[in-house]
């Protein structure tokens, strides 16, 4: 068994352990699988793994199926979804590293739709006029010319979170950032409604990792933002380490993890 195939076998075993009953092999050697999307099991994907995966080539999304009522099925353009999912696959693939788990994790963010609910308008007094009012900052981290800095704030609604984020982005230094990534978790008092989401702002998978961070920290009514100023040199996966490190520092400094 060559190294590529051995890594594929181990990856499929790991994914099957994490998501029991969601994955089946269409080819005995695992070169083609059928997998239901976690949290969205009505959608199934056929994925093929090239001979030189993961050393050189990314997996291919070859078919998307939707198992739902006929009326709802008409709402899905499976050809478009196949193209979209392949873009997600290509974005999480890095030569030499398996990527199926990261791919499935990213799909949850792509497919998630926030239920529509009536919300009370944000009171104008809740929105500061100073871009940094209400935010707690981390220390900046600089690596090979790129600088990362995080900000965390207490919020009680998505509307307040978005208003504060929009105002933060008006600062001259923030406008120069190449990416302003964000994640938030909000639980409203007296209601079972919760709001959890993220925004990569072009830095693929960064927002979902930040959301995962504040989820495992078990903090609520928080928005965390990480700005990255790009210095010209690509730093690979180290960027995610810096994003998470500054995000955690800002959240802790803001008093959420005391």
From Swiss-Prot:
One of its GO terms (biological process) is negative regulation of protein-containing complex assembly. There is a cross-link at residue 187 (Glycyl lysine isopeptide (Lys-Gly) (interchain with G-Cter in ubiquitin)). Keywords: Actin-binding, Cytoplasm, Isopeptide bond, Nucleus, Repressor, Stress response, Translation regulation, Ubl conjugation. SMART domains: RWD. Changing residue 106 to A: Decreases interaction with GCN1, but not with ACT1, and prevents inhibition of GCN2 activity in amino acid-starved cells. GO terms for molecular function: actin monomer binding; protein kinase inhibitor activity; ribosome binding. It comes from the Eukaryota. It holds the Pfam family RWD. Coiled coil: none annotated. It is found in: Cytoplasm; Nucleus. InterPro entries: Impact, Impact_N, Impact_N_sf, Ribosomal_Su5_D2-typ_SF, RWD_dom, UBQ-conjugating_enzyme/RWD, UPF0029_Impact_CS. GO terms for cellular component: cytoplasm; nucleus. The keyword Repressor applies. Residues 10-114 form the RWD domain. Present with 3030 molecules/cell in log phase SD medium. Translational regulator that ensures constant high levels of translation under amino acid starvation. Plays a role as a negative regulator of the GCN2 kinase activity; impairs GCN1-mediated GCN2 activation, and hence GCN2-mediated eIF-2-alpha phosphorylation in amino acid-starved cells and subsequent down-regulation of protein synthesis. In normal conditions, it resides in a actin complex and has no activity. Belongs to the IMPACT family. Interacts (via N-terminus) with GCN1 (via C-terminus); this interaction reduces the GCN1-GCN20 complex formation and prevents the interaction of GCN1 with GCN2 protein kinase and GCN2 activation in amino acid-starved cells. Interacts (via C-terminus) with ACT1; this interaction occurs in a GCN1-independent manner. Interacts with RPL39; this interaction occurs in a GCN1-independent manner. Associates (via middle region) with ribosomes; this association occurs in a GCN1-independent manner and persists under amino acid starvation conditions. PANTHER family: IMPACT-RELATED, PROTEIN IMPACT. This is Protein IMPACT homolog. It comes from Saccharomyces cerevisiae (strain ATCC 204508 / S288c) (Baker's yeast). The gene is YIH1.
